[in-house]
Amino acid sequence: MKQPSALSALVEALRVLPGVGPKSAQRMAVHLMQHDREGAERLGRSLLFATEHLQHCEKCNTFTEAQICEVCSDEERDPTLLCVVETPADQIMLEQTMTYRGLYFVLMGRLSPLDGIGPKEIHFDRLVRRASDGVVKEVVLATNFTNEGEATAHYLGQTLKARGLAVTRLARGVPVGGELEYVDAGTIARAMLDRRTM
């Protein structure tokens, strides 16, 4: 039996999410249509609202509804510290630890030459300009401890150190192969407090 085109379109749309294959997408689509149409409508409205209103912060590249995000606008933050993370989810996890009071730069990815992701795709030039503004004294590399995250940290560290900046890396409280988004706040807090010079 061929499924209705509207259901097929919904299944395909759900497959854009990371880790969602055809069977999971099918289950989600059927669940929404059969058991939670109100939830489906809310999801649709929220996605539309987010795509229309979210943009990248002009300073740190995270998602925001304004030109400059709340963190970059906070005059209580230490502008001499710049923490580099891969994703907004990583930034949120670090903020939840309440151990870091500097500013951020969000790469929106990590180096992965096999996937065609190089320095341009992770906004490397913007990061270098931000870190070299004469205010930043220390750059904290908080990329994930995956192979790509380590390669990204190494590349960024070498380049930023060559510009005379102090570069530190989160300590190894975060498990090797771990991603910040999935690590508990206590572990991230310890890693931030025990960061080391590269």
UniProtKB/Swiss-Prot annotation:
Lineage, opening ranks: Bacteria, Pseudomonadati, Pseudomonadota, Betaproteobacteria, Burkholderiales
Keyword list, A-Z: DNA damage, DNA recombination, DNA repair, Metal-binding, Zinc, Zinc-finger
SUPFAM superfamilies with a match to the protein in the record: Recombination protein RecR
Main function: May play a role in DNA repair. It seems to be involved in an RecBC-independent recombinational process of DNA repair. It may act with RecF and RecO.
GO molecular-function terms, A-Z: DNA binding; zinc ion binding
TM regions (residue ranges): none
PROSITE patterns xrefs: RECR (PS01300), TOPRIM (PS50880)
Organism in which the protein naturally occurs: Burkholderia cenocepacia (strain HI2424)
Matching InterPro entries: DNA_Rcmb_RecR, Rcmb_RecR, Rcmb_RecR_Znf, TOPRIM_dom, TOPRIM_RecR
Disulfide bridge positions per record: none
Short name of one Pfam family: RecR_HhH
GO biological process terms, semicolon-separated: DNA recombination; DNA repair
Record protein name field: Recombination protein RecR
Source organism, top-level taxon: Bacteria
Domain Toprim, residue spans: 80-175
